[in-house]
């Protein structure tokens, strides 16, 4: 982005409006399993009716349900803010920081283990979930985190770091087109077993070569 141009040069046909910059905290609320709710490994079940998603279950922007453990109903119901549904956006905050996943194909109730944020969109009429997922999955987020590190190493991605992360928003209908475009691109990449095209994401979302 430049000061003279508030939208990328590469656009979908018919869209000319400027894009706006908002803070992630203005668009979403972020929740994680807090300390007193932490699970012991002895509570992890090999089967059950309530799935437990951890950061190690993230796989190329999705959740590998085959690696997930399960928990008792009481643990699932403990916190509604970390109950996961299809369309949920998740970010790892411990271990490998900043990995992002979009939940699809979930067939049962699910909750989060410690170390993962549930990013909930406040107004679905203003923000498209697939657009936001693709924006967070692009290198912008980790570039921002690296700058916040100021020469050190961030071992935990705290909410205080994420709240001011800038998100560039086109109008809602254009977000939907962009999100769908990248979803199709991801599907093609998966089909051909190639790595995500991070540089292409940067180019199309910013219009900067």
Where are these regions (language model features)?
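A short beta-sheet element
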Residues: 54-55, 66-137
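Short coil/turn segments at secondary-structure boundaries
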Residues: 37-43, 147-149
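A short glycine-rich beta-alpha junction/loop motif
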Residues: 4-8, 93, 109-117, 150-176
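Localized chelating/binding microdomains
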Residues: 23-24, 104, 134-137, 170, ...
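Amphipathic alpha-helical segments with low aromatic content
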Residues: 1-20, 165, 171-209
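DNA target-recognition patches
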Residues: 25-28, 40-75, 119
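Non-catalytic DNA-recognition/assembly elements of restriction-modification systems
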Residues: 11-35
């Amino acid at each position: 982005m430049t000061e003279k141009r508030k939208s990328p040069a590469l656009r979908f046909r018919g869209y000319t409006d400027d894009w706006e910059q908002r803070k992630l905290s203005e668009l979403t609320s972020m929740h994680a399993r807090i300390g007193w709710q932490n699970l012991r490994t002895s509570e992890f079940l090999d089967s059950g009716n309530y799935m437990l998603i951890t950061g190690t279950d993230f796989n190329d922007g999705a959740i590998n349900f085959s690696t997930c453990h399960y928990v008792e109903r009481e643990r699932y119901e403990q916190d509604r803010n970390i109950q996961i549904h299809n369309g949920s956006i998740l970010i790892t905050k411990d271990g490998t920081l900043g990995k992002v996943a979009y939940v699809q194909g979930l067939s049962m109730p699910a909750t989060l283990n410690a170390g993962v944020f549930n990013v909930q969109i406040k107004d679905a009429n203003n923000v498209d979930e697939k657009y936001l997922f693709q924006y967070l999955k692009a290198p912008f987020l980790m570039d921002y985190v690296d700058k916040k590190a100021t020469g050190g190493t961030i071992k935990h991605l705290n909410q205080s770091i994420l709240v001011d992360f800038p998100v560039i928003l086109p109008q809602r209908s254009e977000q939907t087109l962009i999100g769908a475009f990248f979803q199709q691109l991801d599907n093609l990449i998966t089909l051909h077993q190639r790595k995500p095209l991070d540089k292409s994401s940067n180019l199309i979302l910013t219009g900067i070569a």
